[in-house]
Regions:
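Sequence-level detector for tyrosine residue identity
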Residues: 19, 33, 77, 83, ...
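Charged/polar, low-hydrophobicity segments characteristic of intrinsically disordered regions
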Residues: 19-40, 205-214, 257-270
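Alpha-helical repeat scaffolds
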Residues: 65-70, 102-120, 143-158, 184-210, ...
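Long, compositionally biased intrinsically disordered regions
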Residues: 134, 138, 147, 151, ...
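C-terminal leucine-rich, beta-strand-based interaction scaffolds used for sensing/assembly
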Residues: 3-159, 166-170
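Residues that mark the junctions of alpha-helical repeat units in TPR/alpha-solenoid scaffolds
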Residues: 83, 110, 119-126, 163-172, ...
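Short secondary-structure transition/capping segments
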Residues: 123-136, 171-180, 257-269
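Structural register within alpha-helical repeat arrays
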Residues: 86-97, 132-133, 172, 176-179, ...
Length: 274
């Protein structure tokens, strides 16, 4: 499900599970669900794989295994490109969105996982890790922690020659928008706060819009939050502020239309239809 591309030998070595293959070979129930041919370990069905993962009773079983993998290969990633790609896949917050949104306990287990590996050689100096950690915090509505992670991501990126933090900027925009929406009902909000949210998030979201590696689908997915910001706060705005907000949305729509033309997509099938 997470596309780690590990074969059976990798799993046995990284998790120190020398007995597993024997159990797989002799247990007919395991063989109904798993295949170990050609030194590969596969779940027989992608549907079964997703159900097994998403319905795990104790999410800490998963995070403990992932922590072991990260700590085991953390010292070798610099000389092994394959291991580096594995680390990137494991640390992607998209693996955990289902669990973070499931309940508060699961969310805390996921955040504990990120905390448990933050000081490993790969994670502590990698902007990607801190960006993914921030994204998981945003998913869990833990905005102070997200802000701290983003500051660290920008700091680590600044000392890497030639590193362009385009995706960190996108996550920063997502943080600003989601924090505004989450806090709207519990904090006194002024029209100036709305415009500050609008301008600041837009600046981050489109700062590296033209960078060739920027993931524009993600940029536009984040931009859909403007619709919720507008819905919540439009009654606070005066005529000039309404015009400013709508002008910004029109500019985003124009960029979206250009994106759809370039990719051969349609507005209805685009990442966000505002």
């Amino acid at each position: 499900v997470s596309n780690l591309r590990l074969n059976l030998t990798d799993f046995l070595e990284l998790l120190h599970l020398d007995y597993v293959k024997l159990r797989l070979d002799e247990n007919h129930t395991f063989q109904e669900f798993f295949s170990t041919e050609d030194s590969q370990i596969r779940v027989q069905s992608s549907v079964v794989a997703r159900e097994l993962l998403f319905n795990i009773q104790d999410i800490s079983i998963l995070t403990n295994a992932l922590t072991t993998v990260v700590q085991t290969i953390g010292d070798s990633y610099s000389t092994n490109t394959f291991y580096k790609e594995i680390l990137k896949s494991i640390l992607s917050h998209s693996n955990f969105v289902h669990f973070v949104k499931k309940d508060e306990t699961s969310a805390m287990v996921i955040l504990d996982f990120y905390n448990s590996v933050r000081n490993t050689p790969f994670c502590q100096n990698d902007p990607l890790f801190w960006e993914q950690f921030a994204s998981a915090c945003i998913d869990a509505n833990r905005f102070p922690e997200a802000e701290s992670c983003l500051k660290t991501a920008f700091s680590k990126a600044s000392i890497i020659p030639g590193y362009v933090p385009y995706q960190v900027e996108t996550v920063q925009a997502r943080y600003i928008l989601n924090a505004f929406i989450y806090n709207f009902s519990t904090h006194t909000t002024s029209a100036e706060d709305v415009i500050k949210c609008l301008n600041s998030s837009y600046e981050h979201l489109f700062k590296y819009y033209d960078h060739p590696d920027n993931i524009l689908a993600y940029v536009f997915n984040v931009s859909k939050s403007y619709a919720e910001v507008w819905k919540l706060s439009k009654s606070l705005l005066d005529g000039n502020q309404i015009f400013q907000f709508q002008s910004t949305i029109r500019e985003i729509l124009n960029r979206l239309k250009s994106y759809c033309i370039t990719t051969g997509n349609t507005l209805e099938n685009s990442p966000v239809y505002i």
